[in-house]
């Protein structure tokens, strides 16, 4: 597409993501068909100027300014392309609020990268944007599927290059994500984890991850059940989520194959066949309701296209 002119607005759609899926700590993530939308345009004036407009109640506490994550990501694009920074405005509509374990920071980073790149004629390749996204976020599990879509396994090779494997997630496996009104910061969730783990726990996770990936590829519910277990992070994070274990148990009792903390939490991910989706959703919401926590639990598919941009239609 042609480079948008100053003042012309573009729309960047970025999927929410669920990371870890139990045993895939910091390396496995999937894009969900629950998109965040960022309408962006270059503005005249101070090159460090960033204006943020939030539509709706989700993310109403977020602020603009040069330290905003969207603008920091945008600056990395311009620096990598050898360009001077420009002023930027972003009008944001979030599908879910931040600090819920659904990749809100990754979404902001990817929106900033994709949007800034588009606004200056796309000088950077998607591979370069991916490299910048991982560097800004510090771990790949959310930003990679947020940019590329689908189910992604990302690891740093011996060469120190990031390697991304696009894994198969068969369409018959659906995701129910219970999203509560409570918040949990990623930093708090990471502080709860020990610095060292027993080698037996690491071995168990490796086996579980293999089973989970095969279950997602084939739709084998038994493999998903056996694979969706974790020893590295979930034992230390479940106690941080009010009612979380009750929500997990309710999902399993309603027919889910497996259940995990979504990202750092507090949202809870359940995998199930489509015909069990409504029952699993209702059970999870009811379990949180018993703890005095409001929630919603949409039945979702995997979003395979990743992030993309287009010129904004005038009346959109």
UniProtKB/Swiss-Prot annotation:
Record-listed ATP binding positions: 97-107
- What UniProt keywords are attached to this protein's entry? Amino-acid biosynthesis, ATP-binding, Cytoplasm, Kinase, Nucleotide-binding, Threonine biosynthesis, Transferase
Record organism: Prochlorococcus marinus (strain MIT 9313)
Q: What subcellular locations does the record give? A: Cytoplasm
Q: Which HAMAP family match?
A: Homoser_kinase
- What are its E.C. numbers? 2.7.1.39
Keyword Membrane among UniProt keywords = no
Name the InterPro entries for this protein.
GHMP_kinase_C_dom (IPR013750), GHMP_kinase_C_sf (IPR036554), GHMP_kinase_N_dom (IPR006204), GHMP_knse_ATP-bd_CS (IPR006203), Homoserine_kinase (IPR000870), Ribosomal_Su5_D2-typ_SF (IPR020568), Ribsml_uS5_D2-typ_fold_subgr (IPR014721)
Q: What pathway or pathways are given for this protein in its record?
A: Amino-acid biosynthesis; L-threonine biosynthesis; L-threonine from L-aspartate: step 4/5
Entry GO terms, CC: cytoplasm
Role, per record: Catalyzes the ATP-dependent phosphorylation of L-homoserine to L-homoserine phosphate.
Q: What is this protein called?
A: Homoserine kinase
Q: Entry's Pfam families?
A: GHMP_kinases_C, GHMP_kinases_N
Q: Which example biological process does GO assign this protein? A: threonine biosynthetic process
Molecular function in Gene Ontology = ATP binding; homoserine kinase activity
Q: Which residues form the signal peptide?
A: none
According to UniProt, the reaction catalysed is: L-homoserine + ATP = O-phospho-L-homoserine + ADP + H(+)
Q: Which family does it belong to?
A: Belongs to the GHMP kinase family. Homoserine kinase subfamily.
**Which NCBIfam families does UniProt cross-reference here?**
PRK01212.1-4, thrB
TM spans (from-to): none
